[in-house]
Swiss-Prot record:
<comment type="function">
    <text>The globular domain of the protein is located near the polypeptide exit tunnel on the outside of the subunit, while an extended beta-hairpin is found that lines the wall of the exit tunnel in the center of the 70S ribosome.</text>
</comment>
<dbReference type="GO" id="GO:0003735">
    <property type="term" value="F:structural constituent of ribosome"/>
</dbReference>
<comment type="subunit">
    <text>Part of the 50S ribosomal subunit.</text>
</comment>
<protein>
    <recommendedName>
        <fullName>Large ribosomal subunit protein uL22</fullName>
    </recommendedName>
</protein>
<dbReference type="InterPro" id="IPR036394">
    <property type="entry name" value="Ribosomal_uL22_sf"/>
</dbReference>
<dbReference type="Pfam" id="PF00237">
    <property type="entry name" value="Ribosomal_L22"/>
</dbReference>
<dbReference type="InterPro" id="IPR005727">
    <property type="entry name" value="Ribosomal_uL22_bac/chlpt-type"/>
</dbReference>
<comment type="similarity">
    <text>Belongs to the universal ribosomal protein uL22 family.</text>
</comment>
<dbReference type="InterPro" id="IPR047867">
    <property type="entry name" value="Ribosomal_uL22_bac/org-type"/>
</dbReference>
<dbReference type="GO" id="GO:0019843">
    <property type="term" value="F:rRNA binding"/>
</dbReference>
<dbReference type="GO" id="GO:0022625">
    <property type="term" value="C:cytosolic large ribosomal subunit"/>
</dbReference>
<dbReference type="GO" id="GO:0006412">
    <property type="term" value="P:translation"/>
</dbReference>
<comment type="function">
    <text>This protein binds specifically to 23S rRNA; its binding is stimulated by other ribosomal proteins, e.g. L4, L17, and L20. It is important during the early stages of 50S assembly. It makes multiple contacts with different domains of the 23S rRNA in the assembled 50S subunit and ribosome.</text>
</comment>
<keyword id="KW-0699">rRNA-binding</keyword>
<keyword id="KW-0687">Ribonucleoprotein</keyword>
<dbReference type="InterPro" id="IPR001063">
    <property type="entry name" value="Ribosomal_uL22"/>
</dbReference>
<keyword id="KW-0694">RNA-binding</keyword>
Length: 116
Protein backbone atom coordinates (compact mmCIF):
# COMPACT_ATOMS: atom_id res chain seq x y z
CA UNK A 1 0.00 0.00 0.00
CA UNK A 2 1.46 3.33 -1.09
CA UNK A 3 0.84 6.76 0.38
CA UNK A 4 -1.59 7.70 -2.39
CA UNK A 5 -4.15 5.25 -0.99
CA UNK A 6 -4.24 7.04 2.37
CA UNK A 7 -7.24 9.21 3.21
CA UNK A 8 -6.66 11.69 6.04
CA UNK A 9 -9.67 12.73 8.10
CA UNK A 10 -10.46 15.52 10.57
CA UNK A 11 -13.74 16.67 12.05
CA UNK A 12 -15.50 18.94 14.45
CA UNK A 13 -18.82 18.46 16.18
CA UNK A 14 -21.50 20.77 17.61
CA UNK A 15 -20.55 23.98 15.78
CA UNK A 16 -22.83 26.95 16.34
CA UNK A 17 -23.79 27.45 12.70
CA UNK A 18 -26.50 26.01 10.49
CA UNK A 19 -25.66 23.30 7.95
CA UNK A 20 -27.05 25.47 5.16
CA UNK A 21 -24.63 28.31 5.90
CA UNK A 22 -21.68 25.93 6.21
CA UNK A 23 -22.55 24.24 2.90
CA UNK A 24 -22.41 27.59 1.08
CA UNK A 25 -18.76 27.98 2.08
CA UNK A 26 -17.93 24.28 1.70
CA UNK A 27 -19.04 24.39 -1.95
CA UNK A 28 -16.26 26.91 -2.64
CA UNK A 29 -13.49 24.47 -1.71
CA UNK A 30 -14.83 20.99 -2.51
CA UNK A 31 -12.44 18.94 -4.68
CA UNK A 32 -9.82 21.72 -4.67
CA UNK A 33 -6.14 21.65 -3.73
CA UNK A 34 -5.43 22.39 -0.07
CA UNK A 35 -3.29 25.47 -0.83
CA UNK A 36 -6.04 26.99 -3.00
CA UNK A 37 -8.71 26.18 -0.41
CA UNK A 38 -6.71 27.87 2.37
CA UNK A 39 -6.50 31.10 0.36
CA UNK A 40 -10.21 30.97 -0.53
CA UNK A 41 -11.22 30.50 3.11
CA UNK A 42 -8.84 33.15 4.42
CA UNK A 43 -10.45 35.86 2.27
CA UNK A 44 -14.03 34.65 2.58
CA UNK A 45 -15.88 37.02 4.93
CA UNK A 46 -18.40 34.52 6.26
CA UNK A 47 -18.20 33.21 9.82
CA UNK A 48 -18.55 29.64 8.53
CA UNK A 49 -15.24 30.00 6.66
CA UNK A 50 -13.43 30.22 10.00
CA UNK A 51 -14.96 26.95 11.19
CA UNK A 52 -14.06 25.13 7.98
CA UNK A 53 -10.54 26.58 7.94
CA UNK A 54 -9.88 25.29 11.48
CA UNK A 55 -10.93 21.76 10.53
CA UNK A 56 -8.94 21.94 7.27
CA UNK A 57 -5.78 23.01 9.14
CA UNK A 58 -6.32 20.12 11.56
CA UNK A 59 -6.57 17.68 8.65
CA UNK A 60 -3.39 19.12 7.11
CA UNK A 61 -1.56 18.68 10.44
CA UNK A 62 -2.82 15.07 10.65
CA UNK A 63 -1.51 14.39 7.14
CA UNK A 64 1.94 15.79 7.96
CA UNK A 65 2.43 14.39 11.44
CA UNK A 66 0.66 11.02 11.27
CA UNK A 67 1.32 9.99 7.66
CA UNK A 68 4.25 12.16 6.54
CA UNK A 69 2.42 13.39 3.44
CA UNK A 70 3.49 16.44 1.43
CA UNK A 71 1.03 19.34 1.75
CA UNK A 72 1.55 20.45 -1.86
CA UNK A 73 0.12 17.16 -3.16
CA UNK A 74 -3.06 17.12 -1.04
CA UNK A 75 -6.56 17.91 -2.22
CA UNK A 76 -9.93 17.94 -0.49
CA UNK A 77 -11.62 14.67 -1.40
CA UNK A 78 -14.77 15.20 0.63
CA UNK A 79 -16.38 17.73 2.95
CA UNK A 80 -19.34 16.39 4.90
CA UNK A 81 -21.64 18.87 6.65
CA UNK A 82 -24.31 17.35 8.85
CA UNK A 83 -27.01 18.32 11.29
CA UNK A 84 -26.20 18.17 14.97
CA UNK A 85 -28.40 19.03 17.91
CA UNK A 86 -31.08 21.74 17.91
CA UNK A 87 -31.40 24.09 20.86
CA UNK A 88 -34.99 25.19 21.54
CA UNK A 89 -35.73 28.56 23.12
CA UNK A 90 -38.93 30.42 24.01
CA UNK A 91 -39.45 33.72 22.18
CA UNK A 92 -41.99 36.01 23.91
CA UNK A 93 -44.65 37.64 21.72
CA UNK A 94 -47.44 40.14 22.24
CA UNK A 95 -50.50 39.53 24.42
CA UNK A 96 -48.86 36.88 26.62
CA UNK A 97 -48.11 34.48 23.78
CA UNK A 98 -44.84 32.73 23.06
CA UNK A 99 -43.21 31.15 20.03
CA UNK A 100 -40.48 28.57 19.85
CA UNK A 101 -37.10 29.58 18.45
CA UNK A 102 -34.64 26.96 17.21
CA UNK A 103 -30.87 27.36 17.19
CA UNK A 104 -29.21 24.84 14.89
CA UNK A 105 -25.80 23.22 15.31
CA UNK A 106 -23.65 21.35 12.76
CA UNK A 107 -20.92 18.74 12.34
CA UNK A 108 -18.04 18.97 9.84
CA UNK A 109 -15.82 16.18 8.50
CA UNK A 110 -13.07 16.83 5.96
CA UNK A 111 -11.24 14.06 4.09
CA UNK A 112 -7.97 14.76 2.27
CA UNK A 113 -6.26 12.58 -0.31
CA UNK A 114 -2.92 12.79 -2.07
CA UNK A 115 -2.85 13.62 -5.78
CA UNK A 116 -1.50 10.70 -7.80
Amino acid sequence: MKNRDIIVEAGSKVLRSTPRKLNLVADLVRNKKVSFANVQLRFCEKKAAGFIMKVLNSAIANAQNNYGLNVDNLYIKEILIGKSLTLRRVYPKAMGRANRMSKFYSNITIKLKEIV
